[in-house]
Swiss-Prot record:
Protein name stated in the entry: 6,7-dimethyl-8-ribityllumazine synthase
Keyword ATP-binding: no
Highest taxon in the source lineage: Bacteria
Organism lineage: Bacteria, Bacillati, Bacillota, Clostridia, Eubacteriales
Keywords: Riboflavin biosynthesis, Transferase
EC number: 2.5.1.78
Coiled-coil parts of chain: none
Reaction catalysed by this enzyme: (2S)-2-hydroxy-3-oxobutyl phosphate + 5-amino-6-(D-ribitylamino)uracil = 6,7-dimethyl-8-(1-D-ribityl)lumazine + phosphate + 2 H2O + H(+)
Pathway: Cofactor biosynthesis; riboflavin biosynthesis; riboflavin from 2-hydroxy-3-oxobutyl phosphate and 5-amino-6-(D-ribitylamino)uracil: step 1/2
Membership in a protein family: Belongs to the DMRL synthase family.
């Protein structure tokens, strides 16, 4: 039986990152974690490109443009949607997650979901580098593994 696995080596890979500017205090921590993970696994800073989207809702379109360009081995999507008093949270989080998944399937490029969807600011802070780790770091590690897995399967 042949088994395919993606290695956690980012040398010679190129990554696009789409970050939503809304809740930038949280997203900037996710971004730092993602860049840290890429660099720790061998990626040069010149092989990372960042696009700032106005908010989480706009992330799928920008990630699609990046994925379709063919310039990237993977695209990492980072954002923070925090529940408020209205149903807006439900609509935004649902559409962002669907859009990111559809982009990955449509383009064949790994497009990684690193968008926090939390009930409150405390949960977002916990997931942006405190007691629950940094989900931006985790998303970047997933991007590295998926980029290598796609290359391995294609060989």
């Amino acid at each position: 039986m042949k088994i395919y696995e993606g290695k956690l080596i980012s040398k010679n890979l190129k990554f696009g990152i789409v970050a939503g500017r809304f809740n930038e205090f949280i997203v900037s921590k996710l971004l730092s974690g993602a860049v840290d993970a890429l660099k720790r696994h061998g990626c040069d800073e010149d092989s990372i490109e960042l696009a700032w989207a106005p908010g989480a809702f706009e992330i799928p379109l920008i990630s699609q443009k990046m994925a379709e360009s063919g310039k990237y081995d993977a695209v990492i999507c980072l954002g923070a949607v925090i529940r408020g008093a209205t149903s807006h949270f439900d609509y935004v989080s649902s559409e962002v997650s669907k859009g990111i998944a559809q982009t990955s399937l449509k383009t064949g490029c790994p497009v990684i979901f690193g968008v926090l969807t939390t009930d409150n600011i405390e949960q977002a802070i916990e997931r942006a580098g405190t007691k629950s780790g940094n989900k931006g770091f985790d998303a970047a590690v997933t991007a590295i593994e998926m980029a290598n897995l796609i290359k391995t399967i294609g060989e």
